[in-house]
Amino acid sequence: MTLKERRVGDVSILDLKGRLVLEEGDDILRSRINDLVSEGRIKIVVNLQDVTYVDSCGVGVLIAKYVSVRKKGGDVKLLHLTPRSHRLMEISKLLNVFETFDSEERAVESFAVQRAK
């Protein structure tokens, strides 16, 4: 799996490509989010548009990083879930946990709305 990072204001967007699975993508995502949190960047959008497969380990990384970022006062939101990723999140009841978006603009704007509450 590859990961490219972009920033829109104070929001970090992580564009993933490939398989988010044990020993292929889990360490890459975990490490980058840990680095972002260390830098104080706790508004994170994970773009899953080009992710071809997610296994339970990949889901575990998303959950673990969601929890650790929330403890620091931030949030992790998901963008462009593929039908397969959406179904996996639905089955595992994670659509009730993560905010998901089909629009990058809305995902980024949601942090401003969240702060205003």
PLM regions: where:
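A charged, well-structured terminal subsegment
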Residues: 100-117
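Residues that form or immediately flank small-molecule/cofactor binding pockets and catalytic motifs
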Residues: 8-10, 83, 105
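STAS-typified acidic loop motif
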Residues: 2-31
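Amphipathic alpha-helical interaction surfaces in cytosolic regulatory modules
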Residues: 20-98
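Short low-complexity stretches enriched in small and charged residues
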Residues: 1-5, 33, 55, 108
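General small-molecule cofactor/ligand-binding pocket signal
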Residues: 4-6, 79, 101
